[in-house]
């Protein structure tokens, strides 16, 4: 009996140590995990406001995509490039509610920039891996994101 408990405990320790090598969080079905965030590509085309509203309805804390470094941009690029015909997706970056005061819809700090000045809303041009101003009423695909 003692040997059985010892072996069982040993197997439990091995299992727990191996499970630590996997992601420490799980995203819902259909969402992809990266750096403590979950992402989902939507192939529907919507204007910026409708896409942001749609994202907020998908999961608690979900908003249009925010990008904080080139590694995250590359992750999104790889997830979206093959799926989307025009290679342009809405981002949560805007100054819709406060002119000239750019911010992410998820409230995150604007700590990474890759654009030239222009209109109120932004798209991520995937094939070129850069951001561009876009009329907020135009329709595009989008990516929703939430922090785990």
UniProtKB/Swiss-Prot annotation:
Pfam families: Lectin_C
InterPro entries: C-type_lectin-like, C-type_lectin-like/link_sf, C-type_lectin/snaclec_domain, CTDL_fold
Signal sequence region: 1-23
Family: Belongs to the snaclec family.
Oligomer and partners: Heterodimer; disulfide-linked.
GO CC annotations, alphabetized: extracellular region
Keywords: Disulfide bond, Hemostasis impairing toxin, Secreted, Signal, Toxin
Function per UniProt: Interferes with one step of hemostasis (modulation of platelet aggregation, or coagulation cascade, for example).
UniProt domain C-type lectin: residue ranges: 34-145
Intrachain disulfide bonds: 27-38, 55-144, 121-136
Main location (coarse class): secreted
Entry's Gene Ontology molecular function annotations: toxin activity
Coiled-coil zones: none
Name of protein: Snaclec 3
UniProt subcellular location: Secreted
């Amino acid at each position: 009996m003692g040997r059985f408990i010892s072996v069982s405990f040993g197997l439990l320790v091995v299992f727990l140590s191996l499970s630590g090598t996997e992601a420490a969080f799980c995203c819902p079905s259909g969402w992809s995990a990266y750096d403590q965030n979950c992402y989902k590509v939507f192939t529907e085309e919507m204007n910026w406001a409708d896409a942001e509203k749609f994202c907020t309805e998908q999961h608690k804390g979900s908003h249009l995509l925010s990008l904080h470094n080139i590694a995250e941009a590359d992750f999104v690029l790889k997830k979206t490039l093959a799926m989307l015909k025009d290679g342009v997706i809405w981002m949560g970056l805007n100054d819709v509610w406060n002119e000239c005061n750019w911010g992410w819809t998820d409230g995150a700090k604007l700590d990474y920039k890759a654009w030239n000045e222009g209109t109120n809303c932004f798209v991520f041009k995937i094939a070129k891996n850069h951001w561009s101003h876009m009329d907020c009423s135009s329709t595009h695909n989008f990516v929703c994101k939430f922090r785990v």
